[in-house]
Amino acid sequence: MKKIQAGTVGIGLRHPHYQTLLDQLPTLGFLEVHSENYFNPHSQNRFYLEQIAAHYPLSFHGIGLSIGSSEDISKTHLQNLKQIIDIFQPVLVSDHISWSSLQSNFFNDLLPIPYTKKALSCFVNNLNQTQEHLQRQILIENPSSYLEYNDSEMSEPEFINEIVKQTGCGLLLDLNNVYVSATNHQFSVEKYLDIIDHTTVQEIHLAGFTQKQVNNSTMLIDTHSTLISQSVWDIYQTYMSTKKTDALTLIEWDLDIPKLGTLIEEHNKAINIKQSLCTSDKHV
C-alpha cells in the first residue's frame, strides 16, 4: 500500500483518463475507483489499474454492496471485494447508505432507505457482516435524496451517527449530497453538519449537480456531470475552516467526463482552499 498524506486531495479514476494518467503522471494525492469495475482479473480495467497503482495511493468506493437491504450481503460480492482489497491494499474502502438488490436481483441505482429503528438494525447487521468479512473498517456515505419516507423516526444525520456508533465504521461525507438534499427538502445545511459526528469523517466528496424542473419547482440531481458549484465550494471552505479535519478530499466526475485537465483544475482548487486556510490560521 502506497502511503498517503493526511488531508490530501485526489480525483476519481475513470476509464477515459487511464492512458493520459500513465503518460503524464500528474501530482495527485490519491485516486479513487469504483470497486466493482475491477473485480474481473482479466479485464482492461484491471490491466490499467495494476499499472496506475504503482504510482498513486488508491481508495475503493463501492456502489453494489447494498448494505441497506433487508437481506444479507451477497457472499460472492464480499469475496470479490476482499480479493481486490488484498491485492491493491487501498487506503480507504467505502460504500453507500442505500440498497440496490433484492432476491438476487440487482438494480443499477442507489435506492433510499427509511430512517427507522428497523432499517437501522438491518443496516448495522449488514455493515458488521461486511467489516467482519473484510477484516477492516469501511466508510459509509450520506446519500443524495429526492424523496422522504413518512415513517422515518429520526433525521438523516442522527441515523448516520447511530450507524457509526453501533458499528465503529467511518464516515464519507459528501458535501454535494448534503447540499442537493437540503435544497430538495428545504432543510439547513448548517444544522445537518452540526449534528454529524465530525470525529468520524475520514473522507469528503465534492461533485457537480444538475437542475430539473418538477411540478413547477426546481430539483437538484446528483449527476456528477458538471463542475462543482460555487455553493458547494463555499460549504467546503466553511467546513474545512471550522472543523479542522485531516479527512481526505475527493473530486468526483462520472458522467459527461471531460479531459483530465478539468479534473486537475478542480483538484487544485480544493488544494488552494486548504492552503489559504492554513495561511489564515498562521496569521491568527
Curated annotation (Swiss-Prot):
Descriptive protein name: UPF0276 protein Ping_0944
Protein species of origin: Psychromonas ingrahamii (strain DSM 17664 / CCUG 51855 / 37)
Family in the record: Belongs to the UPF0276 family.
InterPro entries the record matches: MbnB/TglH/ChrH, Xyl_isomerase-like_sf
Stored Pfam families: MbnB_TglH_ChrH
